[in-house]
Each structure stands twice: as C-alpha cells, then as structure tokens.
C-alpha cells in the first residue's frame, strides 16, 4: 500500500508541472516545423581538449524538406571569436530529378581581397554547422524533467549525439542547449527566436 501511495504521489507531482506532460517533448520542438532564426552564444570544447572556446553566431534554418525537421537549408554567421568574425557556413539542399536532395556546404570568409568562398569537398566544414544542427530535433527523447521557475529540460539522444534543451516557462524556443558528440561539447544560450522566411529550398 505504501509503495502504491508513493507511486501515486510521484505521478501527481509530475502532473503538477503541466509543461512536463508527455506531449511537452513534442510540443517543445514545434518551432522546428518551420523556418526560424536565432542568436546563439556560448562555449565549445573540442574532443580531448578541456579548454572551452567562446563563440557567438546567428543561426538561420530553412523550411524542413519532406516533413523531416533535420533536412533543411542552414546558415551559421559568426560574430565571435575574432578569428571567425564574418565567417559564414551554409548548407544548401538542391532537389534532384529523382526526388532526392543534394547537400552542398560552402565556407565563406571576408578578406583584404574580397569575400572568399570555399565549397566543401567532404565533411570538413560540418563542425561549424553543429551549432545549427543542435537546434533540430534529432534522435529520440530520453528524458523530460522539470526545473525551477516552471521550466523543464528535454534530453534527446541518437546518431552519436546527446543534447539537453532547457525551456523556460512560456518560451517557444529553448533558452539553452548542451550538446555532446564525437567532436566535443557545446554549451550555448539561445535568444531572439523568430520565424524566418528565408532559406526555403525550392
């Protein structure tokens, strides 16, 4: 009887956080169903290196292709550190005749000779795109927990990555994302979430 009451109490406590209902894990990522633009700033530490580096960037994500929130045009424009200021990395999806999409990534940076564009030959620039891809709902929801002030966290795991999204009460976009993958760890605050009309693949 005591164990039953304990379980019932725990269940009622969970319900006392309405944002942590089972549907919250789905509703939390409603922003990713459309194009959006945010500002991210924080730190990243490469794998095997515990020294964090600071960064800030504008992230724009286009409309999802075929209902898949992870398939879309992406752009990351860095404002810091100084070595990356003005650098833009874009991933563009081009439709093919067979209904598939070809993904092309371009690294662009300003120089004394004008703007230089370097098309990716492989995946050498994918590390820059992780700050955008971390905002897309990949894998599966593996944890949903309430936090102070009516907020909650959602943990997603899959594809060799794990990300913890912190949502504040009443906020449409996550206010913080913690990402861990084979490249290392990223801690970033998210602000200025807004719908975006750009980066819409034809």
Regions found by a protein language model. Name each.
Residues 21-26, 86, 156-165:
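Charged, amphipathic alpha-helical segments
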Residues 50-54, 82-84, 111-113, 158-160, ...:
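Glycine-centered tight beta-turn/hairpin loop motif at sheet-sheet or coil-to-beta transitions
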């Amino acid at each position: 009887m005591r164990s039953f009451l304990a379980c019932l109490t725990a269940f009622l406590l969970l319900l006392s956080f309405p944002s942590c209902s089972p549907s919250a894990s789905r509703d939390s990522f409603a922003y990713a169903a459309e194009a959006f633009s945010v500002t991210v700033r924080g730190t990243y530490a490469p794998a095997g290196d515990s020294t964090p580096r600071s960064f800030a960037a504008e992230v724009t994500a286009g409309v999802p292709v075929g209902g898949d929130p992870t398939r879309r045009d992406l752009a990351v424009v860095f404002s810091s550190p100084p070595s990356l200021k003005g650098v833009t990395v874009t991933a563009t999806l081009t439709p093919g005749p067979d209904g598939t999409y070809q993904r092309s990534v371009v690294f662009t940076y300003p120089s004394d000779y004008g703007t230089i564009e370097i098309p990716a030959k492989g995946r050498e620039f994918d590390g820059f795109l992780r700050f955008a891809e971390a905002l897309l709902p990949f894998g599966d929801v593996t944890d949903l927990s309430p936090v102070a002030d009516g907020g909650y966290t959602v943990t997603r795991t899959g594809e060799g990555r794990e990300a913890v999204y912190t949502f504040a009460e009443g906020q449409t976009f996550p206010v913080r994302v913690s990402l861990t993958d084979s490249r290392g760890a990223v801690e970033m605050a998210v602000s200025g979430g807004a719908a975006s009309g750009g980066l819409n693949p034809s």
